[in-house]
């Protein structure tokens, strides 16, 4: 499950990076002012860095959740009162 969550985090970060790149290109194409072009590039770099940080934070959180589940025993299976297989 952790790898699935990590893959989802990586995909989300990838989408955010792509959005940042496309937005930067659009902003650079619509202006002739070098200062605005530089600001668009800096904004893109900030968004890309934030996406990477979010991905790393999510990955660390998933690892902590997995570690916590292993030590507390959550996620184990058992049998209910009716004898049916249940998951706690």
From Swiss-Prot:
Region span, Disordered: 1-88
Induction: By abscisic acid (ABA).
Tissue: Accumulates in developing seeds and drought-stressed leaves.
InterPro entries membership: LEA_1
Compositional bias segments (type: Basic and acidic residues): 14-65
Family membership noted in the UniProt record: Belongs to the LEA type 1 family.
Protein's recorded name: Protein LE25
Organism: Solanum lycopersicum (Tomato)
